[in-house]
Amino acid sequence: MAETYTLHVAGLTRELTRCKLNDHMDIAAFIMLGDTELTVAAAGELLKKCPDFDILLTAEAKGIPLAHEMSRQSGKPYVCARKGEKLYMTDPVVVEDQSITTAGKQKLVIDR
């Protein structure tokens, strides 16, 4: 049986599978996709802690449900940074960063 990490968020508890990152570090696989109860509760709690904002920004794809729910609850819009440039982007802004869960660098792109 896989080792787990117990997560307590927004009054809810989840058991997360621990995934070996390297010989010195594990990460807990926290996948909110499909967990509507946790997404709604976490969005509400995060909004209580957020300073005033005009827009939410999330990375494609796992952050989308949380950003969507935070947008729904707050009435503020959200934008998804895509993993690559798209044909419809007229003035893309590109950043690259090293991801701990994806081998190599990860590109994130938004249109101005």
Show where each model-derived region lies:
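Short, catalytically relevant binding-site loops at active-site mouths
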Residues: K62-P65, E85-L87
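Active-site-facing substrate-recognition patch
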Residues: M1-D52
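A generic local structural motif
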Residues: A43-E45, P65-L66, Q106-D111
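Short Gly/Thr/Asp-enriched flexible loops that form oxyanion-binding sites at enzyme active sites
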Residues: P65-S74
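Short, glycine/charge-rich flexible loops or terminal/linker lids adjacent to PRPP-binding catalytic cores
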Residues: K76-R112
